[in-house]
Amino acid sequence: DNLGNIWIGTFNGLNRYNKTTGLFQNHTSNEMQNEGLTHSSIWCIVKDNQGTLWLGTYFGGVNYFNPEYEIYTRYKASIHEKEGLSSPVVGRTIEDKNGNLWIGTEGGGLNFYNRRTREFKWYLAGQGRNSISHSNVKALYYDPAKEIIWIGTHLGGLNKLDIRTG
């Protein structure tokens, strides 16, 4: 992070390694609190251009984490597209050059989160023009020069999404 710490996602929470002190600190979910991690199993971590961490969890959606102040914002699954994720199982996350987030889910396809409008858009298998070949997303790669996202799926092969044209 911007403070020189190393963040490690595990099945048992988020761990911060302080290189100066050599000490670890563990962050786990607590069902009794509405703050903190939504789920302790961390599948992916992305540090955005502001230095904040986006954490993809297994069954807890996405957690936006400010490491300097240790503040979490939770993004969970929703039945309404604009309001949340299509699936709580998040395995891959990338940030585009506009600071927006692309979230690969297991079973819920690709989710786009517009940070300016705070709305989601879902790309699902078999859902018309913006569909992808399978809703189980295993890999994401962003090409900033061409503004293309490559989407690797389980059983559906490789998909190409030009984010300029949709």
Annotate the PLM regions:
Residues D1-G166:
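Carboxylate-rich, polar loop motifs that coordinate divalent cations or form catalytic acidic clusters
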